[in-house]
Design a protein with these regions (language model features):
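Extended hydrophobic leader/signal-anchor segments used for secretion and membrane insertion
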Residues: 1-94
Length: 94
């Protein structure tokens, strides 16, 4: 299953910028590894896109590349059930 999302915000800049599009592919939990960029659902902030820092028994730790990224340093680990997919393709806005 595939999904297209539009990036809002600068938490993953400069790699992903506001207005860019990403294509997600649903993956099995074991298919996620360090360095992958994933989209996941957060109950307070909606869908977020971040890079996997580490995948542990307690959850997935994610980081953003932007200066003030809202990531696991503030939110804690991501529950694997909240992962919507892995970014497989990126289209930059012009």
């Amino acid at each position: 299953m595939f999904r297209i999302l539009r990036i809002h915000g600068e938490s993953m800049a400069p790699e992903y910028q506001s207005g860019d599009f990403v294509f997600l592919m649903k993956v099995f939990r074991k298919g996620l590894k360090q360095g992958d960029v994933i989209a996941f659902e957060n109950r307070l902030y909606g869908t977020l896109i971040k890079r996997i820092e580490k995948n542990t028994d307690e959850g997935i730790y994610v980081v953003g590349t932007g200066e003030n990224s809202l990531d696991s340093r503030r939110l804690g680990p991501v529950n694997r059930d909240k992962v919507q997919g892995k970014v497989i393709w990126h289209i930059r806005r012009r």
